[in-house]
């Protein structure tokens, strides 16, 4: 799934985000679904907080992306994984857990691609 991201988008990433993106791809290829969700939001946060992006990313595009339903869902889902409060879907250890995590990882992948497209299109 992650192989279809335009290489031009990758060139826009700072060195830290590039390393995270490489690990993200490895996690996706190895079905490490929780890691995919965590890394996808980490990459997005890196992009949104990199002041060098202000030279070529439109502020309206940033606001549009930050107000998206998928971006908010990903932040909530990532926080549920990292900050345990109670058992959450995908972590019950039953036969549907892996399926749930995979579906969520695919949605996280879609959100990351959307971030690349919205912020780095020309």
Region roles according to the model:
Residues 60-122:
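Long, charged low-complexity segments
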Residues 24, 58-60:
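Short, charged/polar, low-complexity loop and linker segments
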Residues 25, 30-51:
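Short, hydrophobic, well-ordered secondary-structure elements
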Residues 1-32:
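Charged alpha-helical initiation segments
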Residues 31, 47-55, 78-81, 85-88:
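Amphipathic alpha-helical interaction segments
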Residues 37, 49, 56, 91-94:
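A generic "cationic amphipathic patch" detector
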Residues 16-20, 39, 46, 77:
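Amphipathic, well-ordered alpha-helical segments in soluble domains
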């Amino acid at each position: 799934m992650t192989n279809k991201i335009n290489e031009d988008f990758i060139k826009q990433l700072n060195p830290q985000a590039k390393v995270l993106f490489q690990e993200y791809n490895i996690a996706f290829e190895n079905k490490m679904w929780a890691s995919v969700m965590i890394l996808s939001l980490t990459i997005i946060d890196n992009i949104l907080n990199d002041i060098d992006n202000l030279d070529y990313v439109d502020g309206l595009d940033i606001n549009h992306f930050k107000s998206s339903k998928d971006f908010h869902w990903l932040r909530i889902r990532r926080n549920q994984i990292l900050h345990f409060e109670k058992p959450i879907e995908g972590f019950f250890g039953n036969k549907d857990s892996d399926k749930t995590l995979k579906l969520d990882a695919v949605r996280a992948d879609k959100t990351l691609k959307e971030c690349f497209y919205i912020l780095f299109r020309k």
